[in-house]
């Protein structure tokens, strides 16, 4: 049984990765219903939280049915990060996660996200201070290193563990790679095989088929953190679990299942943000829910341009009739 501190999360847990503009409460809840063992929020700016920015504060919303759920924060200023932790703690997450892996320029340029891979002393200092600040278990998501010449993930993992981190998720690329090339899980395996390590080590990056999840398990890693493969496909977690258990594949989601999922997503988004914003927020998911269906473009266009829930539901009914 894998544990994050005292939280039991299964023998080989599947975690939903924090993804900006994707991992909102409705999507997380759907992934949880479909096999995700732990879910993480979109990353939240520590500076935004302490400014009381609405865009940051709403990312702290969680449903009880999501638990265990982690709220991920990012930043490079110690005082701001500690104040952000105080704010986050009031929302009662099960886990607080620190983002030391985002490769995006606007984050990295401030020394946050993967930018901190250039300053491991600051990484350790921030982690240790956050762990001391909160009673909530602290985890970290990071990358192999800044570039191919500075891959220090074994050292990084040791230092994070020494600082009190309760689990680490590692994306198998460097910052300079962004999302190009293949994720290299062998470095993550080295972290797990380090006799000094005793906290869970999760692999992330390119785990987009059940077979690849099996490879992660075969490497002896504690679990898999799944990101892009789940977009438009919350069923992926159950597909992976079924394959790990039976070595067979579940049939792909039918049109009726896709329509039902899109409808539920919209309903939850409306319940979360109201009709106007709920309709708007769900638009970005339709292309992925109906990906690969021939001649779907006219229906997708209607779904992403409709402003009223009734119009979206009408289009979804037509999809059922036509396909």
Kindly label every feature range from the protein language model:
Residues 1-5, 10, 20, 25-26, ...:
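Alpha/beta catalytic cores of nucleotide-metabolism and tRNA/nucleoside-modifying enzymes
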Residues 1-5, 10, 19-94:
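Glycine-rich, positively charged N-terminal anion/phosphate-binding segment
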Residues 117:
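Aromatic- and acidic-residue-enriched carbohydrate-binding clefts of CAZyme catalytic domains
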Residues 19-21, 44-46, 74-76, 101-103, ...:
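Active-site beta-loop-alpha junctions enriched in small/polar residues
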Residues 82-112, 121-199:
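Alpha/beta enzyme core
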Residues 14-17, 39-41, 69-73, 96, ...:
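Hydrophobic faces of well-ordered beta-strands that scaffold small-molecule active sites
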Residues 2-15, 47-68, 102, 108-110, ...:
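N-terminal small/glycine-rich loop or linker at the start of catalytic domains
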């Amino acid at each position: 049984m894998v544990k994050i501190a005292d939280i039991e999360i299964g023998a080989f847990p599947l975690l939903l990765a924090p993804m900006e503009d994707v991992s909102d409460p409705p999507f997380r809840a759907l992934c949880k219903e479909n096999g995700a063992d732990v879910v993480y929020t979109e990353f939240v700016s520590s500076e935004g939280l302490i400014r009381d920015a609405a865009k940051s504060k709403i990312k702290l919303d969680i449903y009880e049915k999501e638990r265990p759920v982690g709220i991920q924060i990012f930043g490079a200023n110690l005082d701001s990060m500690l104040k952000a932790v105080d704010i986050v703690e009031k929302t009662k997450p099960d886990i607080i996660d620190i983002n030391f892996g985002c490769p995006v320029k606007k984050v990295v340029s401030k020394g946050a996200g993967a930018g901190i891979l250039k300053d491991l002393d600051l990484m350790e200092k921030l982690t240790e201070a956050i762990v001391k600040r909160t009673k909530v278990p602290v985890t970290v998501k990071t990358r192999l290193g800044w570039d191919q010449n500075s891959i220090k993930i074994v050292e990084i993992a040791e230092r994070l563990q020494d600082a009190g981190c309760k689990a680490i998720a590692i994306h198998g690329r460097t910052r300079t790679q962004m999302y190009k090339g293949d994720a290299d899980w062998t470095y993550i395996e080295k972290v797990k095989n380090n006799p000094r390590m005793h906290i869970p080590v999760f692999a992330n990056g390119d785990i987009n088929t059940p077979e690849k999840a099996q490879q992660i398990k075969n490497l002896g890693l504690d679990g898999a953190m799944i990101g892009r493969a789940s977009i438009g496909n919350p069923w992926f977690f159950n597909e992976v679990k079924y394959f790990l258990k039976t070595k067979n594949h579940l049939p792909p989601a039918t049109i009726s299942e896709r329509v039902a999922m899109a409808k539920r997503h919209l309903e939850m988004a409306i319940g979360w943000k109201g009709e106007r914003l709920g309709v708007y927020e769900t638009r970005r998911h339709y292309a992925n829910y109906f990906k690969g269906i021939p001649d779907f473009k006219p229906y997708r266009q209607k779904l992403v341009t409709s402003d009223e829930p009734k119009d979206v539901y009408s289009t979804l009914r037509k999809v059922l009739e036509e396909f």
